[in-house]
Amino acid sequence: MSAILFPEYTHRHLLGIEGLVPVEVTALLDRAEIYANRNRSANKVSDEMRGRTVINLFFENSTRTRTSFELAARRLGADVINMQVGSSSVAKGETLIDTAVTLNAMHPDVLVVRHAESGAAALLAQKVNCAVINAGDGAHEHPTQALLDALTIRRRKGRLGGLDVAICGDVLHSRVARSNIHLLTLMGARVRVVGPRPLIPSGIGELGVDIFHDMREGLRGVDIVMMLRIQMERMQGNFIPSVREYFRYFGLDREKLALAKPDALIMHPGPMNRGVEIDSDVADDFERSVIREQVEMGVAVRMAVLEVLSGNLASMETA
């Protein structure tokens, strides 16, 4: 029997952060660290996934995430197929299953899935033989975003444990927030969510976070300020009185940022709504904003995840 290539991470898929243990997260981050350094060198391309096929199956538009996964796979030498599917064409679970069966017949090695419905990636994982990576499912999880955020923080701060992190804004509709809460609390950070009452989900405190409805109090003394995009496309009803009022009370500007630690990092998963959840002055702060670095770390993290899952899949095939 062949040994698992990456024994620190033995899952066939990456469907979420919830359920992982610290050693698994650390293994993925350590592997991503190698690629982060390699990606800054002249020779970025390798052959760890030569002969492997990655299908990007996106039922929601996401140029940034899809491009990041595509670049990651190509830098590992994989063949990449991008399938952009309008969410309206997959209205029933049976149709999604039919899609899975069809793709499975093509024998891909990795399926990267983004879908508007929570649990879609997990459903596909039950129907295919390849590895499945959840690239975002509804408001549920976005595991590679949390991993790239963690890598960005660890590279700047040297650790995750013991840090105070404020996740601010539209937590209700944010899969990024949920995955980050799972990962950061797992790794020993203290997490607080900050936002207006309508945008903070009920029961969020059960995940081990503190809750603040006052932005200034929520930012006081934190090491990391993670802003979230206001997701108007997912809102039905009046969650905020106006964009102008939202920015006044919950938008990140110099005045509010001054309440965080002097060396606090500014983060945002993108795309940003400048003048809504974040002011351009702080978003572009050369010393403290790591928003562009998050994009850079996204490629490294996705290279690590793709390599680990495809490598272990190969080990399972020869077992």
UniProtKB/Swiss-Prot annotation:
Enzyme Commission number(s): 2.1.3.2
Top EC category: transferase
Cellular component GO terms, alphabetical: cytosol
Catalytic activity, reaction form: carbamoyl phosphate + L-aspartate = N-carbamoyl-L-aspartate + phosphate + H(+)
GO biological process: 'de novo' pyrimidine nucleobase biosynthetic process; 'de novo' UMP biosynthetic process; amino acid metabolic process
Binding positions for carbamoyl phosphate per the UniProt entry: 64-65, 114, 142, 145, 270-271
UniProt superkingdom: Bacteria
InterPro entries: Asp/Orn_carbamoyltranf_P-bd, Asp/Orn_carbamoylTrfase, Asp/Orn_carbamoylTrfase_sf, Asp_carbamoyltransf, Asp_carbamoyltransf_Asp/Orn-bd
Pathway: Pyrimidine metabolism; UMP biosynthesis via de novo pathway; (S)-dihydroorotate from bicarbonate: step 2/3
GO molecular function terms attached to this record: amino acid binding; aspartate carbamoyltransferase activity
Pfam family for this entry, one: OTCace
Keywords recorded for this protein, A-Z: Pyrimidine biosynthesis, Transferase
NCBIfam families: asp_carb_tr, PRK00856.1
Subunit (UniProt): Heterododecamer (2C3:3R2) of six catalytic PyrB chains organized as two trimers (C3), and six regulatory PyrI chains organized as three dimers (R2).
Family: Belongs to the aspartate/ornithine carbamoyltransferase superfamily. ATCase family.
Function: Catalyzes the condensation of carbamoyl phosphate and aspartate to form carbamoyl aspartate and inorganic phosphate, the committed step in the de novo pyrimidine nucleotide biosynthesis pathway.
UniProt-recorded name of the protein: Aspartate carbamoyltransferase catalytic subunit
Gene name of the record: pyrB
